[in-house]
Amino acid sequence: MKEEFYLAGKILKPKGLRGEVKIQPVTDFPDSYLERKIFYVGKSEEEAVRRTVRQAALRKGFAYLLFSGIDTREKAEEIVGFSVFVRSDALIQLPPDRAYLHELRGLKVLNERHEELGIIEDVLGMPAHDVYEIRAEGGLVYVPAVEEFVEEISIDEGYMVLKRFEEFL
């Protein structure tokens, strides 16, 4: 069975001479970089190699990691642009009112009367708040991911109820 991986960040550049790399986290929980001991690093999920974290730090919104087997600047330069993944079984347990992006993609979107309106294609990270990209009958519709418009989310049952959806058509 193929392991499932989820994107946790992108390697931006080496830092220093010992192989440390600067990473742009793609998570609402950057502190998890300080706690995790294992990441998978590669150009893609299929090419990802298991790496043990020897040292971790967070500074100004970036993670700085020193991986085993990457002990020179030259080796660090070889993985610049690579993605950093975590295995699905290593994801942090979220509180009931939170969900991972991969759990939201594909959810049915319903109105207050529970009539189907479309499917969530993606969740876009915007400066003010996330935005749901919904494939509806007339094309793509963008709805702010805020309480004012979200009545209910049921990951287990596979749907999201939106209020005032017609305002975005």
UniProtKB/Swiss-Prot annotation:
Domain writeup: The PRC barrel domain binds ribosomal protein uS19.
Disulfide bonds: none
Keyword tags: Chaperone, Cytoplasm, Ribosome biogenesis, rRNA processing
Annotated function: An accessory protein needed during the final step in the assembly of 30S ribosomal subunit, possibly for assembly of the head region. Essential for efficient processing of 16S rRNA. May be needed both before and after RbfA during the maturation of 16S rRNA. It has affinity for free ribosomal 30S subunits but not for 70S ribosomes.
Domain PRC barrel: 96-168
Primary location class: cytoplasm
PANTHER family documented for this protein: RIBOSOME MATURATION FACTOR RIMM
Family statement: Belongs to the RimM family.
GO molecular function, one term: ribosome binding
Location relative to the cell: Cytoplasm
Gene3D superfamilies referenced in this protein's UniProt entry, alphabetically: PRC-barrel domain, RimM
Protein name: Ribosome maturation factor RimM
Binding partners and assembly: Binds ribosomal protein uS19.
Gene encoding the protein: rimM
GO cellular component, as recorded: cytoplasm; ribosome
Biological processes per GO annotation: ribosomal small subunit biogenesis; rRNA processing
Pfam families assigned to the protein according to its UniProt record, in alphabetical order: PRC_RimM (PF24986), RimM (PF01782)
